[in-house]
């Protein structure tokens, strides 16, 4: 390895390295924008164009395959820097008749010639989804492919749409509600009941008549309940609920009154201040 890459350094001031006889030169240096000679041309739209002609050699000599790596120029300040790398490697010995018909391909910088240059990185070709294929003889071809493959899918057939509709069909058992609302049926004497019980605001006349009826009868019979409801323009349920609430209210009053009476009895006349003053 060391004997093959044995490069003595000569003429160090000009940054030129001279190799042993029989090997190619490896040139590194800063080149100006006018003196930089490249094998490929740099197009203004940001793409790298192919060379116009391929190198040919005499039939008697072995074919030397070179790779050129051309980098875009970067302007910094007042000077322009560029790099031109020439790698000399892979000597091929071909017959004269093979050398005439052989097309020199353009090898990638990494030593593989399987990936062509694509215009997806910059320029208008990136939007169109195309590839530029470069060949050694200067030919340039544009390979196009559809932008969106999924946009050209065939539409859904009629049978498939019918199948989807059948799977999404709503059956009768799915329409049944789990908690059906309560419906108010007819009352005992033919008076229709209400669907939703709403708090009734009784008028003064209705409250007076109900209080009179409650004073005489705390519990009403069915016949009397219907008569009171018809006379007060109420239904049987409203009269029944009112009497239930009135009885509960009366019980609370009696209970509260009983507690007060019991407290008065427990205190007695001896504990009262008037009884103490009247005593001698």
Swiss-Prot record:
Compositional bias (Basic and acidic residues): 261-280
Molecular functions (GO terms): DNA-binding transcription factor activity, RNA polymerase II-specific; RNA polymerase II cis-regulatory region sequence-specific DNA binding
Subcellular location: Nucleus
Annotated region (Disordered), positions in chain: 46-65, 249-280
Cysteines joined through disulfide linkages: none
Cross-referenced Pfam families: Homeodomain (PF00046)
Keywords: Developmental protein, DNA-binding, Homeobox, Nucleus, Transcription, Transcription regulation
Any single Gene Ontology cellular-component annotation: nucleus
SMART domains per the UniProt record, alphabetical: HOX
DNA-binding region of this protein: 195-254
Annotated motif Antp-type hexapeptide, positions: 170-175
Cited CDD domains: homeodomain
Family: Belongs to the Antp homeobox family. Labial subfamily.
Record's function text: Sequence-specific transcription factor which is part of a developmental regulatory system that provides cells with specific positional identities on the anterior-posterior axis.
Name assigned to this protein: Homeobox protein Hox-B1b
Native species: Takifugu rubripes
